[in-house]
A protein has these predicted regions:
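Hydrophobic/aromatic-rich alpha-helical bundle segments in the mid-to-C-terminal region
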Residues: 120-129, 142-190
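N-terminal positioning helix adjacent to the helix-turn-helix/winged-helix DNA-binding module
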Residues: 5, 9, 13-16, 152
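N-terminal intrinsically disordered/low-complexity leader segments
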Residues: 1-8, 191-193
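Amphipathic alpha-helical segments used for helix-helix packing
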Residues: 98-118
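Hydrophobic alpha-helical connector segments
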Residues: 58, 62, 72-98, 152-156
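Amphipathic alpha-helical packing segments from all-alpha helical-bundle domains
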Residues: 65-68, 73, 83, 116-143, ...
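Helix-turn-helix
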Residues: 12, 16-54, 58
Length: 193
């Protein structure tokens, strides 16, 4: 019975922090605000998350997991690698609109860090690497030459991330749509070779 309560408290803390980090950012969200809004004791927070940095890392993993779950659902039944890449841009656009153009959680957090934290840096790099590898795996199904596949994947990933950031800046999906058109053109020219 105790384990269920611990999971519930941990989850409640994480949900509260997720909302606050998303709405007002990491730096503007204080530990005391998280404690107050979650309605928990300070000891409970520190039992589950020894530091704000640890809480942030859990938040980043949660957001990344949610993104990949949504992406998996969005790509269900699509076998063609080119179409999977293109539909990934559509999924991101839907995600951005749904989240009021909040952007990528990893990029948002890292951009707030004048003094980069080792735990958060590692988490962001790990999560971005997972996204990059997603595009690498698809590019390798399109392009048999390993070097060309890597160049293709890196280009797509840069367009994806850059488009995401620009959507956050302009609060509009137009930049991601432009990035998607560039990727379609890139994939089309690759097909014609």
């Amino acid at each position: 019975m105790m384990e269920t309560q611990e999971i519930t408290v941990r989850e409640h803390i994480l949900l509260t922090a997720t909302r606050l980090f998303h709405d007002q950012g990491y730096n503007l969200t204080g530990i005391n605000q998280i404690i107050d809004e979650a309605g928990i004791a300070k000891a409970s927070l520190y039992y589950h998350f020894p530091s704000k940095e640890d809480l942030c890392v859990a938040y980043l993993h949660r957001k990344n997991s949610m993104w990949f779950s949504a992406l998996e659902s969005h790509l269900e039944g699509i076998e063609d690698s080119r179409q999977r890449i293109i539909k990934t841009f559509d999924c991101r656009a839907n995600h951005l609109k749904k989240n009021h153009f909040g952007g990528c959680s990893s990029i948002r957090i890292i951009s707030e860090m004048p003094q980069r934290g080792e735990k958060i840096d590692r988490a962001v790099i790990q999560l971005k690497e997972k996204q990059r590898k997603f595009f690498v795996s698809l590019a390798e199904q399109i392009e048999t030459n390993k070097k060309k596949a890597m160049i293709l994947a890196e280009t797509i990933f840069l367009l994806f991330d850059g488009g995401t950031v620009q959507c956050q800046v302009y609060r509009d999906i137009a930049p991601l749509q432009a990035a998607k058109r560039a990727v379609v053109s890139l994939l089309q020219s690759d097909l014609e070779k």
